[in-house]
Amino acid sequence: MIHAILKMGDPRLLRVAAPVERYDTPELRALIDDMFETMAHAQGVGLAAPQIGVDLQLVIFGFERNDRYPDAPAVPRTILCNPVIEPLSDEMEDGWEGCLSVPGLRGLVPRYRHIRYSGYDPAGQRIEREAEGFHARVVQHECDHLIGRLYPTRIRDLTKFGYTEVLFPEMDPNAD
């Protein structure tokens, strides 16, 4: 089922999400299926449960190709419960981000370039991976939703925040 995606200004996006406590349940599997369907419908590269009003530490991400990020390399399809992120260096990298909860806007956001992330898959099996570049950016962006943070709060220079159609007139106007 496709869910409505909450938009910036909705107080539910500012909450700290609760940990997933029960794995491998029909409810969790149905939620994950709904999240993937919602993400695909919105042409997203990731989605956090709080974005559809579900107060759980659950994120999904991954794509082969995405019109919203045409130059981005593929990111493996991942389901991550109760994620933890560890920067593997102090190196930060600025990159343009958008968000399904902040439609039509883009901002230049600093993120750690190289991270390790861990958590659990839907069956409760531990996952641990390293990521860099755009993959690392997507993980950090989605996990921010679990602590009630949206990317505009990370922007250092607000002259690098605006409407996608103005900042990137060459992009498909339906991409955000």
Curated annotation (Swiss-Prot):
Keyword Iron found: yes
Species annotation: Bordetella pertussis (strain Tohama I / ATCC BAA-589 / NCTC 13251)
Gene designation: def1
Cofactor(s) required, per the database record: Fe(2+)
The keyword Chaperone belongs to this UniProt entry's keyword annotation: no
CDD domains noted in UniProt: Pep_deformylase
Active site: E142
Stored Gene3D superfamilies: Peptide deformylase (3.90.45.10)
Identification of the protein by name: Peptide deformylase 1
